[in-house]
Every structure is written in C-alpha cells, then in structure tokens.
Amino acid sequence: MGAERRLLSIKEAFRLAQQPHQNQAKLVVALSRTYRTMDDKTVFHEEFIHYLKYVMVVYKREPAVERVIEFAAKFVTSFHQSDMEDDEEEEDGGLLNYLFTFLLKSHEANSNAVRFRVCLLINKLLGSMPENAQIDDDVFDKINKAMLIRLKDKIPNVRIQAVLALSRLQDPKDDECPVVNAYATLIENDSNPEVRRAVLSCIAPSAKTLPKIVGRTKDVKEAVRKLAYQVLAEKVHMRAMSIAQRVMLLQQGLNDRSDAVKQAMQKHLLQGWLRFSEGNILELLHRLDVENSSEVAVSVLNALFSITPLSELVGLCKNNDGRKLIPVETLTPEIALYWCALCEYLKSKGDEGEEFLEQILPEPVVYADYLLSYIQSIPVVNEEHRGDFSYIGNLMTKEFIGQQLILIIKSLDTSEEGGRKKLLAVLQEILILPTIPISLVSFLVERLLHIIIDDNKRTQIVTEIISEIRAPIVTVGVNNDPADVRKKELKMAEIKVKLIEAKEALENCITLQDFNRASELKEEIKALEDARINLLKETEQLEIKEVHIEKNDAETLQKCLILCYELLKQMSISTGLSATMNGIIESLILPGIISIHPVVRNLAVLCLGCCGLQNQDFARKHFVLLLQVLQIDDVTIKISALKAIFDQLMTFGIEPFKTKKIKTLHCEGTEINSDDEQESKEVEETATAKNVLKLLSDFLDSEVSELRTGAAEGLAKLMFSGLLVSSRILSRLILLWYNPVTEEDVQLRHCLGVFFPVFAYASRTNQECFEEAFLPTLQTLANAPASSPLAEIDITNVAELLVDLTRPSGLNPQAKTSQDYQALTVHDNLAMKICNEILTSPCSPEIRVYTKALSSLELSSHLAKDLLVLLNEILEQVKDRTCLRALEKIKIQLEKGNKEFGDQAEAAQDATLTTTTFQNEDEKNKEVYMTPLRGVKATQASKSTQLKTNRGQRKVTVSARTNRRCQTAEADSESDHEVPEPESEMKMRLPRRAKTAALEKSKLNLAQFLNEDLS
C-alpha cells in the first residue's frame, strides 16, 4: 500500500509542474514510475493528452504554462535515454508517437494558441531528444510536412516555433532539402524580423545558405543584423568566405548606424577572425587584401587598436634597423599600412601616445632620406614590361607602400625648423623626379601643402615645381656658324704653313750649326703644334648649352595639373587668382581643356572649376565653356563639369551667369525712357536662366547613373539653399526617387530621401512648393504609358508622401511663427486644389487617390465654410461609392468643426468681459479654440511625418494614418463639450509597485482547469 501511495498521478504532476521552484527531474522520475506500473498504457496516454490540452489553449507566454510544456516534453522524451533497454524503448516509445500523432492532427486548428503550442511542443520534443535518438520515418515525414505548412502561418509566433522545430530536420548537404529551401525563402522574405532572427539562429551554414546569412547583415532591423554577425562569427570559418565578402562584412559592420551592431561586429566577428589568424594582426590584414581595401583595413586596425594595450601595438614596429625605421627589404603592404595607421592612432592619443610614437618614428631629417631612397627604388614601366602582369603587380605593390610612407609624414614632428626645411626640400625633389609614379603625386602635394601655411608661398613653390617638371633644364649641342667654321679652317691652314716653314728653318739651322736659333725654332714649333691641337679639338666638338625644353606629353601634363588641382583645393577662396595663377591658367589649364587625352581634359576641367570659385568674373567668363564640356565630352569629364557648374551656382547664384546683363546708364543728359527695351532684356535674362536650368535638369533623365545622381544632388542643394524655387524640378525629383530605374542608385535614393523632409519642414514656402507639385506629379503618374517604368509606381503612396511633407504640424518651430499670421495653411490651399481637380474630372480613375488624400489633410476651421460648398458640389457629381463615403465623413467632420468654431468665437467674446483673475486662462482657451480641427490632428499627426517609403516600394502600410484619422474623428465628436487636449498630456506612468501588482494578478493558474472532471 505504501508503494501505491507514492505513485504520482498525472493530474498532480501537472499541478506541481506549475510551481516555479519545483524540481522537474524528480517529477519526471515519479511520473515514469507511475507509467511503468500501469498495464494499459492507452489510459495513461489519453489522460496525459487530456491535461495537456488545457495548456495548449493558452496563447500568452505565462510562466506556469511554459513550465508545464517544459515538463511534458522532458517526461515524454525521458524514455529515449541511452541507458534504457531496447525492448523498453520500443514499448515506451509509444507515448512519444501518440503525442506526435495528436499534435500533428491539431496543427491546423483554427485557434492561434493551439497552432502555436503544437509547434512549440514539437520543437521542445525534438530538442529534448538525445543526439542518437530515432523516430519512425513516417512520423518524421509527417512532422516535416506539417511544420513546413506552419512556416506559412499568418501568426509570426507560430512561424517562429515552426522554424525552431525544423532545425533538427534540415540536411545542409542536400541541395534539394525542403527545409533549407524554406529557410532560404523565409530569411529574405518574411515580414517579421523575429522570424528572420529565428531562421538565422537555426539555418545551417553551407555553400547555398552562406550568401543568405551574409545578406542579413543588410537587414533593416538592428536585431537581425546583430544576430547575423554573431552567427557568422560562431558558425562560419573565415576561409569559407571570399575576400570580397570579408571586406563587405567589415565595411558594413564597422560603419553601421547602430552601436549594438558595431559592438557585435568588433566583439564577435572581428575577434573570431583574429583567433583564426592566431592573433597575428598582419596575417589578418593579409586575408583582407589591403591594397584594394585600405579604408576598410584602417577601420579594422582602429577597432583593434582601441582594445589593445599601446605597448603591445608598438611591438610589431620595433623590428627596425636602429634608426627607428623598418628596413626597406622587409616592407610589405600590411606592415606599411599597420605602421601608418598606428602612427595616426598614437598621434590622436595626445601626450599618452606621443611617448610610444617616438619609439617607432625617427626625426624628419632621417625619415626624409628614407622616403627618398624608397621612392627612387620604385621601378619604371618600360614598353617591354607592359604585358608582364607580375611586374605590374609588383610595381603596384611598391606604389601602395610608397603611399603609406608618404601618409606617415602627417605624424612627424615638423615644429623644428631644420627638419621641416629638409622635409620640404626632399618632397620637392621627389616631385621633380621624372620617374615618380603619377599615383603618388597627389599624396606628395597634399603633404607638401600641409606643411606650408601661407597661400602665396604655396603658389610660389608649386609653380616652381610645375616649371621644373614641364620645362626641365637640358644640355644640348649647338652647331657652329658656317662663317666661324671657315675662319677656323683658314687658321688651321695658316698654322700648318707656319709649321712647315719652321721645320725647314730648323733643318737649315742644324745644318749651319746655329744652335741658338734652332732652340728658338723648336719652341715655336711646339707652340704651333699646341695651337693646331686645340683648334682641332674645337672643330671636332659641338658646343654644349643648357636650355629649357617644354614637354607636352600626357604624363607630364597630368602631373602638372594634379599639382595645380591640389593647390587650388587647399587655397582659401579669399586669396583670389594671383598673376602667377593666371599664368598657369593660360599656359596649362585652358590648353588642357582641348587636349586629346581624356585624363588631361578631366583634370583641366577640375582645375577650371576650382579657379571659378576663386573669382566671380573668371567664373562668369568661362561658364559657357563648362556648359559646352558638359554637353559634348566623355562621361567622366561631364560629371566633373557638372559638379563644377553646381559649385559655382551655389557660390555665386544664377545672376552672374546670365549672358544678357541690364546695364543702367548713368551718363549725364541720358534718360532711360524705353521701358520696352528693358523688359525685353529682362525676358532674355529669364530665358537664359531657364535654359541653364533646363540643361542641368535634363541630366535627371540620363542613362548614366553618376550623371543622374550629380544632377539630382546639385538641384537639391540649390533648392535647399534658396537659390532655386521650382515646383516642376521638385516634381521631377520626386518621380526620380520613386522611379524603379533608380532602385540600385543608393547614393541618389539616400540623398533625396534626406532632402525631401528637411527641405519641406524648413519653411512654409518650401511646403507651398510641394503643394504646387502635388497635382502635376500625380497627373504624370496617371498618364504614364504601360511601357514606362513610372507605371509601376503606386500613386496612392506618392500622394501620402506629399500630404505628409506639407503638414503644418511638421514645420520646424522657427518656421511655425510665420504660419501663425496666415489664416489658411498649406493643407487648406491643397484641399481647394484637390476639390477643384475632382470637379474638373469627377469620373477620373484618380478620384479615389484625391479623396483619400483629402481625408488625410489637416484642415483649419477658417476653410470649413468654403470647403463645404465645394464638397456639396462634388457629392452631386461623383458616382463612386467608396469616394462618396469618404467625402461624407469629411463633410461631417467639417460641419462639426465649423459649428465648434462659431461657438468658440462667441465664447472668446464673452471671455473678454470676465474678471482679470481668469483673463490668462481665457486667453489660453481661446488659442486652443482658434483651430480645433488642426489642434486635435497636430499632436496625432506628428508621428506620421516620416517619409512613407525609403526605396520607392509600391505598397506601403497605411494603418498608422488610418488610426490617426479614427482618433481624430473621436476627438472631434467629443469636442462639443470639452476643450480638446493633446493626447500626450492624458498619459500617466504607473509606479513600479502598481506594475508589479498588476503582473502578479495577470499570472495564470491552471489549477481551476485541472480540477475539472474528465470528459
């Protein structure tokens, strides 16, 4: 009898399992003992399922329910432990199969709770089974099929549990595995971020699924991106990814807007890859291909520097030759980049890093000689080496190392005069070298100009370098004049005759034994011989002279223009164009515009644009030249010219560039009586401005994405700065943003996506520009032919965007001051335009779009009377039932607002007769009553002022706006009796104790269900 008392009933086990501190392992053992004593296991199965049903109808994640589910899964799978007998496994496995059968029959129930609990239980059962557990193939197939169906459930939580349940049923080695295919679809297309996170945590990495996992690092939700980096760090080896994938992951993660994602990248993925590289930072850099992704590599190094002691970082650069320099023969791209990045990092640490910086950097004098020797060692590409890719690759590697060595100059201490002069001299010497690679010129000039502060000194030095490069001193031989040659020949003949005569006289003297005379003749003969030899040498040798020879080859012009461009970029605008600079313009820049080499023309256009920023007259003089380049040259040069034109328009405005200028005559005795002539000049000027803007705006339709983006950015800047006001161009920008053709233009989409709200909410004038663009934009979309990409754009979505951008409540606080002085808002004017458009074409297909936009407007009470007249006319002409219902609601709302406005006006008049005690309160109420409709809507509309689409998607959820309109209607219906107050003022925050008490009350106790009799 004692043994029977110790047997635990199923009901009691379920009751005890709810308790938070209950030892579930003991409960499992106790209930297992009861199970073994029963002869008829079917009774146990049915009773177990009966009590389990009570928890399966609860959707909320109650702690008691979760504990019971956990207990049930542990108990059922406890019979599959490895130490059980084989016959027991077969016998006791019946409970698991029975439970699976029941769950699989219930997975299609109408109740969300039941479907959720079925998937949860299957997930728990499969997860609690040991590694070597086996189930029937038939049961496996049924579970697989049922959970694949539940992956398409309408409830996200059900889909999540189905994803988790299928994790042990996937076969990553099978390319046709249905589970893997379903995961690959869900991870990209499921609308719920938690479902995508669940798939990320379950999907097994393989060659097929790796791109899907990597793609989630671009997910719109921060939590998904964060988990994606964690999964990649834990489950994917670095070698499994290509270099492009590694660089892309690091670039995105380190530049992510979310700090949590950045931390996940640095803490998990970056540290994991460093462990794969055995802690060797240089080896990690080698696996990132630093030559082609130096910016990403520098970001990686800075992230690693921030978590590594400075003494440890400096250790990698201490393998020097005693001069604090890394030997040239041991320099690699990774070491050079590490050295440069570390120097910049230590420089940024101030006094703390200065001590360590001195350990890895020498004095400027020593470093200057080191840099010069390395640059001189870079080989030159000859014609025979142009086809040798290994030679070219080695040359590019050396150039990359040279770039890093040049960048290290930023970290040198140039405060000492001697070191600074030496460094400047070496930089100038390097720039003059004929073998200097062009890729290093801009880096060298930038460092040179950084050391020199004075603009005039900069101009002087750069001009000298340009002169040395373009017109170097060369020694040449000069042919003598024919007359001089003739004179030398005559002199040579004369010397020869004298030699003959002297030799004959010498023989006679010897014969006569006149030795004194003979010695004199010998000396004379020697002098004549010397004269003959010298004259012979002069005749044979050409005259050598040092002359300046001007070079006009493409490489020389490119170097000179780079020098000029870097100088112009560094010069202050207030400096202007000096005489020296004008000389460079005439001799170098303007001839470069017509060069046959595209690289030279592009640099010349860049220089011309920078010169225009220095002087307005110069800009006006050469503006037409830039326009010509913009129309006829290559794409790259067109882009440079387009940017230069927009820069000059931003600096000086459109006025200086009108070809026809009104010249007011101030001469005595001259009167301007010809008004017609002045008007014609103004018309010509206006036409000129329009032609320029038309030329620029036409590039919005260019097939070249860079030209489209440049034109859109430039026009957006002009509009935002107030230099351009054009609803037509604004309409084209909106259409360009939505156009599916620009879907891949990330920079264009991002630029316009930021521009629209900032521009619209800056002032009422800008909102009026959007108001004017409203109807033309929608009409363009409505009239677009089926073959046009514009036909794919959702007109309703565009209308919602424009309505939100013109909301009076969205204006900046500074801009709202001007709004208060005007009776009608932008939405009021827009409402009138929409109503008139509906009356113009009451049967148009766009009537529903207009009606929906009309119902979303924030209308003031001042407009109610006039708008009601138009609405009555519209109701008589429009036949569409959907539109009629929406218009009726608008009419009712306006009638209420009109009535309230009249009552409030009377109340305001009565308020002026009250005592001074209540005067301030009455004035406050009067302000609230002035625009009751706008007052209620303003607070609720503030949440919907964001853009309705960021990437031109066709369908957009509009539930937020629907809820806002519902709340507005409710507020308006109650405003007859009380003053409408902002919704935010009615919210109260409950104290922590009240929240705790409410939570305790909400906890579900299953005892009342378990006490019911079995049916």
Swiss-Prot record:
Instruction: Provide the Gene Ontology terms for cellular component.
Output: condensed chromosome; condensed chromosome, centromeric region; condensed nuclear chromosome; condensin complex; cytoplasm; cytosol; membrane; nucleus
Q: Which UniProt keywords apply?
A: Cell cycle, Cell division, Chromosome, Cytoplasm, DNA condensation, Mitosis, Nucleus, Phosphoprotein, Repeat
Q: Name one Pfam family in it.
A: Cnd3
Query: Which Gene Ontology BP terms does the record give?
Result: cell division; mitotic chromosome condensation; positive regulation of chromosome condensation; positive regulation of chromosome segregation; positive regulation of chromosome separation
Q: Which domain of life is it from?
A: Eukaryota
Positions annotated as HEAT repeat? 94-131, 138-173, 174-212, 238-275, 276-313, 399-436, 439-478, 617-654, 687-724, 865-907
List the expressing tissues: Highly expressed in testis.
Region annotated Disordered sits at: 941-994
Sites of Phosphoserine modification = 390, 674, 973, 975, 1002, 1015
Q: What happens to this protein after translation, modification-wise?
A: Phosphorylated by CDK1. Its phosphorylation, as well as that of NCAPD2 and NCAPH subunits, activates the condensin complex and is required for chromosome condensation.
Signal sequence, start to end:
none
Q: Which residues carry this modification: Phosphothreonine?
A: 931
Q: Where is the composition biased (Basic and acidic residues)?
A: 974-988
Q: Which InterPro entries match?
A: ARM-like, ARM-type_fold, CND3, Cnd3_C
| Ranges of Polar residues composition bias in the record | 941-950
On subunit structure and binding partners, the annotation says:
Component of the condensin complex, which contains the SMC2 and SMC4 heterodimer, and three non SMC subunits that probably regulate the complex: NCAPH/BRRN1, NCAPD2/CAPD2 and NCAPG.
So what does this one do?
Answer: Regulatory subunit of the condensin complex, a complex required for conversion of interphase chromatin into mitotic-like condense chromosomes. The condensin complex probably introduces positive supercoils into relaxed DNA in the presence of type I topoisomerases and converts nicked DNA into positive knotted forms in the presence of type II topoisomerases.
Q: What other comment is given for this protein? A: Overexpressed in some cancer lines and some tumor cells.
What's the family?
Belongs to the CND3 (condensin subunit 3) family.
Q: What is this protein called?
A: Condensin complex subunit 3
Q: Which gene encodes it?
A: NCAPG
